[in-house]
Amino acid sequence: MNFLLTLAYDGTNYCGFQVQPNGRSVAAVFQDALEAVLGARPDIKGCSRTDAGVHALGFRLNFHADTRIPPEKLPLALNQHLPPDIRVLAARVVPEDFHARYAAHTKTYLYRIHNHPIDSPFDAAYYTRIPKHLDEVRMQAAAQQFVGTHDFLALCAAGSSAAAHGDTVRTITDCHVTRRGDEIDIEVTADGYLYNMVRILAGTLC
């Protein structure tokens, strides 16, 4: 059977989602849990490859496995073998040819800014602090310039394989800025991203 799972994870202690030769990845830790529950270590296909330190609220992945465990029981079974910073939220069976990466037509990133001189002691790991006052109205107007299909080479960090191969055209379908008190959220939806693209985009708007 082909299982589709939804995960949430705190990426602080990981080198990213994808398995890396030198580093602790979300995928490797998740596969350890799969092996503990299923007695096998199936290949997993993630919807994206988040970078080091990036968190996920609704990350989709799929894998094929022969098991009698019903999908509704998988979240509890896997969560018992996962660290507290990775959680399976839901699981279901999908068609055999389903592939999480190819089925993900858009991906949404949320970049949070704490617009205050002093950090919050409770969630400082989940935002970037900018002490100077930011004008969210002007930021929202500027954000609209990114919407559409463009060559985003200028928003790509050095060392990107996509940039090396000239594959830097992406389509942003939505980019908006909202403020709630001292918190500013920059939310971007696109068909794909370059290395550190959202971080650089957020820095440009600020």
What are these regions (language model features)?
Residues M1-C206:
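Structured-RNA-binding interfaces characteristic of tRNA pseudouridine synthases
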